[in-house]
Curated annotation (Swiss-Prot):
A Gene Ontology BP annotation from the UniProt entry: DNA replication, removal of RNA primer
Protein name per its UniProtKB record: Ribonuclease H
Membrane-spanning intervals of the chain: none
Domain annotation RNase H type-1: ranges: 1-143
Pfam families recorded: RNase_H
Catalyzed reactions per annotation: Endonucleolytic cleavage to 5'-phosphomonoester
Gene giving rise to this polypeptide: rnhA
Species whose genome carries this gene: Neorickettsia sennetsu (strain ATCC VR-367 / Miyayama)
Cofactor: binding comment: Binds 1 Mg(2+) ion per subunit. May bind a second metal ion at a regulatory site, or after substrate binding.
Main location: cytoplasm
Length: 151
């Protein structure tokens, strides 16, 4: 089984505001590919989710062994701890409110189920090479709406 490592990040200038996402997909021992995109009106959490979704959807075949690194506690806890309860509780959170970004969570859950995924959280802005790359690309995507460079 082919093994991949994915680093993802999302950024938003304002919340809501212009957003960008990025992922680097590393096939062990062979190559790296960076994918990215933007939305004119989004939130940081949507961009974080979209980065992971787009990275996993980029595989043409199911059944990949993937390690996903995210610096988003929202994504990490959502997919590893909260989603099963949300589904069991008809997409209600622990406070009884509707889960935000439900459609994106459903999409992520479905695509992740097609692969063997290990989820890992990485501290942001802590010198991790690939995390820094996706952070820079995501911020650049978000900034492209304002014709300014991110800080």
């Amino acid at each position: 089984m082919e093994e991949y490592v994915i680093y993802t990040d999302g950024a938003c200038l304002g919340n809501p505001g212009p957003g960008g996402w990025a992922a680097v997909i590393i096939q062990r021992g062979t190559n790296e590919k960076i994918i990215s995109g933007r939305e004119a009106d989004s939130t940081n959490n949507k961009m974080e989710l979209l980065a992971v979704i787009k990275a996993l959807e980029s595989f043409e075949q199911k059944g990949k062994r993937v390690t996903v690194y995210t610096d988003s506690t929202y994504v990490y806890k959502g997919i590893t701890a909260w989603i099963e309860s949300w589904m069991k509780n008809k997409w209600r959170n622990s406070s009884g409110g509707a889960v935000k970004n439900k459609e994106m969570w459903v999409r992520l859950h479905g695509i992740a189920a097609a692969h063997t995924v290990r989820w890992l959280w990485v501290k942001a802005h802590n010198g991790d090479h690939y995390n820094e790359i996706v952070d820079r690309v995501a911020r650049k995507e978000a900034a492209s709406f304002t014709n300014c460079e991110p800080e």
